[in-house]
């Protein structure tokens, strides 16, 4: 429980500084990941996902919480091309479970503006 409180405090502090960081990151022209925090319990990163620039196919071994710093529609695309749209509202958090073994996906920002998300990935099973 104490670790969860620490993570929540860290995420809240990060969200408060997001506006300042965003001013620096406005010059970004392609999708980028910015590591924020990493230990044996959680891994936290911020990603700015540019419009219509698919991320490389990848896999998530662990469950994660996505916090939409800016809202929009993120299309989750599997290797066969099937699209699962996720509509994320600014300031809201969303739970995404670990992916099944060997499953892959790509993320595509379906909007016309960059989307910023904070990802908190849990590293341990309960």
Give names to the regions the model predicted:
Residues 100-125:
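Ligand-binding loop in jelly-roll beta-barrel domains
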Residues 60-80:
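Glycine- and acidic-residue-biased ligand/ion/polar-headgroup-sensing regions
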Residues 52-56, 92-95, 99-106:
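Histidine-centered metal-chelating micro-motifs
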Residues 1-9:
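Bacterial N-terminal signal peptides that target proteins for export
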